[in-house]
């Protein structure tokens, strides 16, 4: 119950910020594409973007099969606080900021980018969870068989960017909520483990 309430609070903070504020620019003004390749095979941490978990190790997402090519020299390098999205799955939420690892590589099909100095990545991450972003993104999907969002389409999406102090304040509020959610999930996990342990003891 508490976890759901915290998630709703996070959503409310995000929606209030973007619903009440008029766009003062487009995403292309605040982001830049990153397409550095893993030419020398320097990195082997192959990642995917999940619509629920963000960046995850590809080996964990597809445990029953190998998805990555043996030759990853054409894979794109993503660094901490970079963003990536699957053009064909962004409509179901497959866009994320890299926070779990310092660096990794993703399939060439992913679009990768980073924020410019005028915006903090936490604020941009919040925007990507807003209804405003979803509405504007859906209007820019293209394709006859599979709908995709190009980088150009992403750059054309209008966005409200406040001054740095407001960005930081919003980022801190959301980070605090996410931290509390993480602690509650960890606590529930421990309770479940304890329950399983006690049940096993009862039937020994």
Give the positions of each predicted feature:
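Juxtamembrane/interface motifs at transmembrane-helix termini
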Residues: 4-8, 19, 48-49, 62, ...
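Charge-rich, acidic-biased intrinsically disordered regions
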Residues: 25-29, 57, 198-204
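A structural feature that tracks compact, well-ordered secondary-structure segments
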Residues: 1-5, 14-17, 159-162, 168-190, ...
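Non-catalytic DNA-recognition/assembly elements of restriction-modification systems
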Residues: 5-40, 156, 160, 166
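DNA target-recognition domains and sequence-specific DNA-contacting regions of bacterial/archaeal
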Residues: 28-161
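Generic recognition of stable, solvent-exposed alpha-helical segments in well-folded globular domains
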Residues: 1, 8, 73, 79, ...
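Short, well-ordered alpha-helical packing segments
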Residues: 3, 7, 28-31, 110, ...
């Amino acid at each position: 119950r508490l976890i759901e309430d915290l998630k709703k609070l996070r959503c409310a903070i995000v929606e209030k910020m973007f619903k009440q504020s008029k766009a003062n620019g487009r995403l292309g003004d605040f982001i830049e594409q990153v397409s550095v390749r893993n030419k020398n095979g320097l990195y082997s941490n192959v990642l995917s973007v999940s619509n629920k978990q963000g960046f995850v190790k590809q080996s964990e997402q597809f445990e029953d099969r190998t998805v990555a090519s043996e030759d990853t020299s054409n894979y794109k390098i993503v660094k901490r606080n970079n963003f990536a999205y699957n053009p064909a799955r962004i409509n179901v939420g497959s866009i994320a900021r890299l926070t779990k690892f310092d660096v990794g590589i993703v399939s060439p099909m992913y679009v990768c980018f980073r924020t410019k100095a005028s915006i903090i990545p936490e604020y941009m991450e919040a925007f990507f969870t807003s209804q405003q972003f979803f509405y504007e993104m859906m209007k820019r999907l293209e394709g006859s068989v599979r709908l995709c969002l190009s980088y150009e389409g992403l750059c054309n999406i209008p966005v409200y960017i406040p001054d740095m102090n407001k960005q930081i304040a919003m980022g801190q509020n959301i980070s605090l909520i996410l931290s509390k959610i993480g602690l509650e999930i960890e606590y529930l996990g421990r309770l479940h483990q304890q329950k399983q342990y006690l049940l096993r003891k009862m039937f020994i």
